[in-house]
């Protein structure tokens, strides 16, 4: 019994008797760039499955495709898992006794098992060059002529240092496996390609390395995209050849941009890092991603990470593709922003203020206004661009069908307001300022909007603002508010 199987046995034996083996899931990304939404969802589901039953969540770096590796990508993986709270129990920097956890540091292990698989007739040496392979493909299923080589011919080619790969040997018959999402699946073995397991440079392919690692690391539940359903029968044949226990499979549906297209960074779709840069909160992103393919019981959709652990159920993962709805993420992120304390929101908003605002205004009051009105933090710059100076003067902004305003009656209203404000000494009291506008509307026998809307436009020259007339006037102060109202009066008087 090798050390890995011995460790597995020890984990199964607890106290006076046998218990179920501890659940161990893994997240095994390739360091090829930013964290895609689909990859992060795979990590999240693996984490939730493990933690729901007090299991272990393992990080493994699958870097066998050296040509695609991007410098700094491993650090992105570490940072993303840290920021999202998906703390792994074992990984490259947390040895749990199953390492190394980086595939490029496990080459001798893969080579050993590849050659052992050959001895078990589950794989064979292939000496074909690329042209032979292309020429022998039929309907994308490679028929390897090296099957016909005798043991003597193989030994001769090996002794001559003829370059080779090790390919899987697939015998006739059928392979059946069970998936927790898609149920029982049976395939004819003659539809399976005898793919390369070990390349001529000694590196394994993903299709081989993931099997060896999952077994040796005692992974009990494998979470991955449903694009791997087609390869799973080949994996199971290898498990069976080695007489290894097959893990529980959870294949999850793809995350789609729309009904026809998958999310793709190549096509400009947002990665996790992009969303964070746009001002979405980690907690909101994780909450939303959890719902991409999983439906909780009941109507509740807002879950903390600990609540997700408690409520997550594999049986409620859908087979259908999940559509990434940015509008819903905005809505959810807005809820998370509004649930922050004012102080915490203010801290998040301060970097935006520091880049834009030069006028001396009460920034905490500005945060109080903004917190109720934005969906994500990158909306802040457009919301506050009027603070230093009003935006480009445009008299058409004063026309509003709902408020029944136009440039002519807006001019009239602003003159009323200008006269009332000039003798108003309680500008620091926003309630008193509100009453001033309301009383003025009553005095002039007009609707409140006939006063409030022209004032709001005059103070900002924007059709959409973070607050109403009272809030904006209070933030700008009396002198600046009067200055801007005078500017609007001059503009409207020029007609």
Residue ranges and their predicted role:
Residues 17, 46, 77, 117, ...:
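Residue-level signal for inorganic ion chemistry
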Residues 2-138, 232-244:
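N-terminal Rossmann-like or analogous alpha/beta NTP/dinucleotide-binding catalytic cores
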Residues 25-31, 58-63, 217-222, 438, ...:
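Glycine- and acidic
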């Amino acid at each position: 019994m090798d050390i890995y199987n011995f460790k597995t046995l020890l984990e199964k034996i607890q106290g006076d008797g046998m218990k179920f083996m501890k659940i161990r899931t893994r997240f095994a990304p390739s360091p090829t760039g930013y964290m895609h939404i689909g990859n992060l969802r795979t990590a999240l589901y693996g984490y939730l499955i493990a933690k729901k039953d007090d299991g272990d969540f393992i990080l493994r770096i699958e870097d066998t495709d050296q040509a695609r590796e991007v410098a700094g990508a491993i650090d992105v993986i570490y940072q993303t898992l840290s920021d999202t709270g998906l703390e792994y129990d074992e990984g490259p920097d947390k040895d749990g006794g199953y390492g190394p956890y980086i595939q490029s540091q496990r080459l001798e292990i893969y080579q050993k098992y590849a050659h052992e698989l050959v001895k078990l007739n589950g794989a064979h040496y292939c000496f074909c060059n690329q042209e032979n392979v292309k020429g022998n493909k039929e309907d994308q299923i490679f028929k390897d002529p090296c099957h016909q080589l005798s043991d003597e011919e193989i030994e001769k080619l090996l002794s001559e240092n003829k370059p080779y790969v090790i390919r899987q040997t697939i015998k006739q018959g059928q392979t059946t496996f069970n998936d927790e999402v898609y149920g029982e699946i049976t395939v004819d073995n003659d539809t399976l390609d005898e793919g390369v397991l070990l390349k001529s440079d000694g590196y394994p392919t993903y299709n081989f390395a993931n099997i060896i690692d999952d077994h040796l690391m005692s992974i009990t539940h494998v979470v991955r995209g449903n694009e791997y359903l087609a390869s799973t029968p080949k994996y199971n044949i290898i498990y069976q050849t080695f007489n290894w226990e097959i893990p529980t499979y959870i294949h999850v549906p793809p995350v789609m941009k729309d009904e026809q297209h998958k999310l793709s960074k190549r096509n400009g779709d947002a990665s996790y890092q992009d969303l964070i840069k746009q001002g979405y909160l980690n907690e909101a992103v994780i909450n939303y991603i959890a719902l991409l393919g999983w439906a909780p019981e009941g109507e509740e959709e807002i879950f903390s990470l600990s609540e997700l652990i408690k409520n997550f159920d594999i049986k409620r993962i859908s087979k259908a593709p999940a559509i990434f709805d940015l509008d819903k993420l905005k809505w959810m992120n807005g809820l998370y922003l509004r649930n922050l304390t004012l102080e915490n929101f203010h801290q998040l908003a301060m970097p935006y203020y520091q880049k834009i605002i030069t006028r001396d205004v009460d920034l905490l009051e500005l945060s109080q206004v903004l917190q109720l009105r934005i969906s994500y933090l990158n909306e802040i710059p457009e919301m506050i661009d009027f603070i230093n100076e009003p935006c480009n003067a445009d008299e058409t902004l004063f026309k509003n069908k709902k408020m029944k305003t136009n440039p002519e009656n807006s001019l009239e209203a602003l003159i009323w307001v200008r006269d009332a404000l000039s003798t108003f000494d309680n500008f620091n009291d926003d309630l008193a300022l509100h009453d001033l506008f309301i009383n003025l509307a009553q005095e002039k026998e007009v609707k409140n909007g006939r006063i409030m809307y022209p004032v709001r436009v005059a103070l900002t020259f924007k059709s959409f603002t973070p607050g109403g007339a009272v809030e904006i006037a209070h933030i700008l102060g009396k002198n600046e508010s009067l200055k801007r109202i005078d500017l609007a009066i001059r503009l409207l008087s020029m007609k």
